[in-house]
Regions:
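Short beta-to-alpha transition helix within the HATPase_c
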Residues: 1, 13-31, 82
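Conserved short strand/loop->alpha-helix "switch" segment adjacent to the catalytic nucleotide/phosphoryl-transfer site
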Residues: 9, 35-55, 105
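Conserved ATP-binding N-box helix of the HATPase_c
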Residues: 49-71
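Glycine-rich/acidic phosphate-handling loop/turn and adjacent ATP-lid/helix
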Residues: 82-111
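Short alpha-helical Gxxx[C/S/T] motif in the catalytic ATP-binding
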Residues: 113-117
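Glycine-rich ATP-binding loops of the HATPase_c
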Residues: 124-135
């Protein structure tokens, strides 16, 4: 059996999450960005799979819009908990509201991506930590699985 030269190895056994990651890998490569992923998760999720994919898509979309040269993602499953980490480098200044919330820099963006991530995590007793240091935007989220 011959393997196609440009064939992509799946990220994980979960079909829906693999599809999301594959889509964003393709988009990142089309933008000339390095896309790295370390995924260690079960095939089946105990948490709402659709909500997890919405959260993942929103974080990756934000990274894709802002990344200067790379996007790095890590998903781990340990002790009935999923942890998700999305990082990208960026140039320029980030905008924040008076309440210290991040604001969209997209000309036609709604700014609802992070808000929907926060809402999903809140409804699932999750945790969100966002840091921006030395030109790196780093989002870390955990939720029960």
């Amino acid at each position: 059996m011959e393997i196609e030269k440009n064939a992509k190895i799946p990220f994980c056994e979960n079909t829906l999450i693999n599809a999301v990651l594959s889509e964003y890998r393709t988009k990142a490569e089309q933008e000339g960005l390095e896309f790295s992923a370390r995924i260690q998760m079960p095939k089946e999720l105990a948490c709402d799979e659709a909500e997890f994919c919405v959260m993942l898509s929103n974080l990756l979309e934000n990274s894709l819009d802002a990344a200067k040269s790379y996007i790095a993602i890590s998903i781990k499953h340990l002790n009935h908990q999923l942890s998700l980490n999305v990082k990208n480098d960026y140039e320029g200044e980030l905008k924040k509201s008076a309440e210290n919330n991040y604001l969209t820099t997209k000309p036609q963006g709604s700014g609802l991506g992070l808000k929907s991530v926060e809402a999903i995590l809140k409804s699932n007793s999750g945790f969100l930590k966002i840091e921006d240091t030395d030109g790196v935007f780093d989002v870390f989220a955990t939720l029960k699985n």
